[in-house]
């Protein structure tokens, strides 16, 4: 008895060969690490100028993202050092407020601390609502 040809089931063969697949892969972006703040920078620019008088180029957005990243990194490093000096393993809101008090001066300090308190009150209200 002759054996019939075995029919293999599974995925259909890809129309792209290996060389074409390498070409079609998405290139990784070469933007700065601070590009995670891109949406925040755009939102703030819309809040500052609701009638769209301010137009930001991609380079200016990258610069502002880099500045934001550096600032957040500096605050986080200082807050971490303050927490370690006290003997804590976690950074709390009081450490972040202390870092702002050390780094900033004048009206910017007051504004930053007020924003931290607003964020904390929103977070606590949200957790109470659950």
UniProtKB/Swiss-Prot annotation:
Family: Belongs to the histone H2B family.
Pfam families: Histone
Assigned keywords, A-Z: Chromosome, DNA-binding, Isopeptide bond, Nucleosome core, Nucleus, Ubl conjugation
Record note on quaternary structure: The nucleosome is a histone octamer containing two molecules each of H2A, H2B, H3 and H4 assembled in one H3-H4 heterotetramer and two H2A-H2B heterodimers. The octamer wraps approximately 147 bp of DNA.
Cross-link Glycyl lysine isopeptide (Lys-Gly) (interchain with G-Cter in ubiquitin) placement: 122
Subcellular location: Nucleus; Chromosome
Keyword Zinc-finger appears in the UniProt entry: no
GO MF annotations in UniProt: DNA binding; protein heterodimerization activity
Function: Core component of nucleosome. Nucleosomes wrap and compact DNA into chromatin, limiting DNA accessibility to the cellular machineries which require DNA as a template. Histones thereby play a central role in transcription regulation, DNA repair, DNA replication and chromosomal stability. DNA accessibility is regulated via a complex set of post-translational modifications of histones, also called histone code, and nucleosome remodeling.
InterPro entries, alphabetized: Histone-fold, Histone_H2A/H2B/H3
A cellular component annotation (GO) from this entry: nucleosome
Source organism of this protein record: Encephalitozoon cuniculi (strain GB-M1) (Microsporidian parasite)
Name of protein: Histone H2B
Biological classification of the source: Eukaryota, Fungi, Fungi incertae sedis, Microsporidia, Unikaryonidae
